[in-house]
A protein has these predicted regions:
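Terminal intrinsically disordered/low-complexity segments used for targeting and assembly
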Residues: 2-80, 127, 140, 164, ...
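Short, low-complexity intrinsically disordered segments enriched in A/P/G/S/L with frequent Arg
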Residues: 3, 12, 487-498, 507-511, ...
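Membrane-embedded beta-strand positions in outer-membrane beta-barrel channels/transporters
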Residues: 75, 141-145, 189, 234, ...
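A short glycine-centered flexible hinge/capping loop motif at secondary-structure junctions
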Residues: 220-224, 431-435, 472-476
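Sec/SRP-type N-terminal targeting helices
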Residues: 86-87, 103, 150-178, 228, ...
Length: 521
């Protein structure tokens, strides 16, 4: 047999033996079990279907619907100065940097090294006698080392894609933090406004009580009243003053809360003036399709990217079962003896190049455990994503039901205040004419006070319901894109799913670098 053929057969035998041995470590029986929901699998209720008429998304700066310039400025400052958003932004930068580290592993790695040193060569059992025995010479070298992962099984590529997907998760989480901050500021601002409205009611009640006391005193002085009536008129005054003081405290605390939410000190909050909130046309929805309702929510987007990242993790773990082949080489100069720079001459040139192969054979089950962990991580991400979808659609329905209820309650509350006001006016006229005692006036006044408080609470709840609904929808669209077309959504093209490059064994779409998992996942 020719020598060259024999050599090739030996090489082939080595490869066959290697692959046979590697079969001792297999991926059999390990696969993810989770299956992600499609949003359209979730049925919508009557509240969502009713709201889907004359559809228009809120604008990106949705809080401007309240028509309060002070609120607009405060939210803009909060987005710039909030420590919580600064942390979220730092996490985004950190994740992007980690993605850069992972992507670098796909590139050629080149390192330079140089050593200049004096070397004493002894005569002993290691060196032995020779030309360099008992001499001191230069022992120098300089060169470039090169390595490149051929990535035959996609390990490095999938690790890089996974890091990019995790970076996108951090972006979506940062958007979620921003949306929650905006919602918290709006809700705190609404409570700030409510305290002012409640104070107006209490202050008006105090003026009424003082007028009644003055009238009771005049009736007593005129001989048609009693000391008991005067005492009755005086009794509620201290409590009303206490309520005024409590509301002043609540207003001051609201200022502090708004300042803290914006990342500012109490001194900045002290400059806040009374809110002027007025909500216009109710918010409509783009359609009754859950995929469109949920597509903007940052937590849903983050969940999808997390599923994509875990799918990449499975591919990374699976690639570990196959041989790893790197191309390595070096080019440089080296010399022992001669002058200090003699090693830089052409005749001292040295180089090497070739593949470096590593193959797992026996590892005590480590690789199978890693694959099992990745598959379980995928199942966890899918389950979390499914729960996020269910919770998100429930939240939208809850806020729509709440908003509709608040609109109805607002009408009833206004009617109750009007009726209580008429009752109080009649009681006051009767008391002034001596046709009734003070107790009827007090009861009528208490009823009016209660109904006015309820009316303001309902109005505050209606304003809060709007903010909560916008938050449940994931915020608004950019100005000028106030349509039902979600292709203009702020996450579209950078975070929302488009299409899939491949479908791994886990059953979920593995997206391309610039894409997220398919809505089918």
């Amino acid at each position: 047999m020719p020598r060259c053929i024999s050599r090739e057969l030996k090489t082939l035998s080595v490869w066959v033996l290697t692959l046979t041995i590697s079969g001792c470590i297999g991926t059999g029986g390990i696969a993810p079990q989770g299956e992600a929901l499609s949003p359209n699998q979730l049925a919508t209720d009557e509240a969502i279907r009713e709201a889907a008429r004359d559809a228009h998304w809120p604008s990106r700066q949705w809080w401007k619907a309240y028509g309060d310039p002070q609120l607009d400025r405060w939210i803009e400052q909060a987005v710039q100065d909030s420590p919580s958003l600064a942390m979220a932004a730092a996490r985004v930068r950190q994740a992007r940097a980690m993605a850069g580290v992972a992507e670098a592993a796909e590139s050629v790695q080149i390192n330079g090294e140089a050593t200049l040193k004096r070397h004493n060569w002894p005569t002993d059992q290691f060196y032995g006698p020779g030309e360099l025995a008992n001499t001191t010479t230069w022992d120098n070298n300089a060169g470039l080392g090169l390595s490149y992962a051929l990535d035959l099984w996609g390990r490095e590529r999938n690790a890089s894609e996974q890091a990019v997907d995790l970076a996108r998760v951090s972006v979506a989480e940062a958007r979620q933090a921003q949306l929650e901050l905006q919602n918290n500021i709006v809700r705190a601002y609404i409570q700030f406004s409510l305290h002012y409205a409640q104070r107006d009611i209490v202050a008006a009640t105090l003026r009424q009580q003082e007028q009644i006391l003055e009238l009771a005193q005049k009736r007593l002085d005129g001989g048609i009243g009693t000391h008991f009536e005067v005492s009755q008129a005086q009794a509620p005054l201290p409590e009303t003053h206490r309520q005024l003081d409590a509301l002043d405290e609540a207003i001051a605390l609201s200022r502090n809360q708004l300042a803290a939410l914006a990342g500012k000190g109490p001194g900045d909050g002290a400059g806040l003036q009374r809110p002027t909130l007025a909500l216009g046309t109710p918010l409509k929805l783009p359609s009754a399709l859950p995929a469109e309702l949920l597509g903007q929510r940052p937590d849903v987007v983050a969940g999808r990217w997390q599923v994509a990242a875990q799918a990449r993790g499975i591919d990374v773990a699976r690639a570990g079962f196959y041989p790893n082949v790197d191309l390595v080489g070096s080019l440089g100069y080296m010399a022992t003896g001669g002058g200090a720079l003699e090693f830089l001459t052409g005749k001292k040139l040295t180089y090497n190049v070739g593949p470096a192969i590593s193959l797992p054979i026996f590892d005590g089950g480590r690789l199978r455990s890693q694959l099992g962990e990745a598959a379980a991580g995928y199942d966890i991400a899918v389950a979390h994503y499914n729960q996020t979808l269910v919770t998100a659609l429930k939240s939208i329905s809850d806020q729509l039901i709440r908003r509709e209820s608040m609109d109805k309650q607002q009408v009833f509350a206004a009617e109750s205040v009007a009726a209580a006001q008429r009752t109080y006016d009649i009681a006051m006229v009767a008391f002034q004419r001596g046709l009734t005692d003070y107790l009827n006036v007090l009861n009528a006044q208490s009823l009016l006070f209660k109904q006015q408080q309820v009316q303001q609470q309902v109005e505050a709840a209606r304003l809060s319901a709007h903010a909560d609904l916008v938050t449940a929808l994931g915020g608004g669209l950019e100005a000028g894109n106030d349509t039902a077309d979600l292709s203009h959504a702020p996450w579209r093209g950078s975070l929302l799913p488009l299409d899939c490059a491949a479908v791994p064994s886990g059953g979920c779409c593995a997206p391309k670098r610039e894409q997220a998992p398919s809505p089918r996942c």
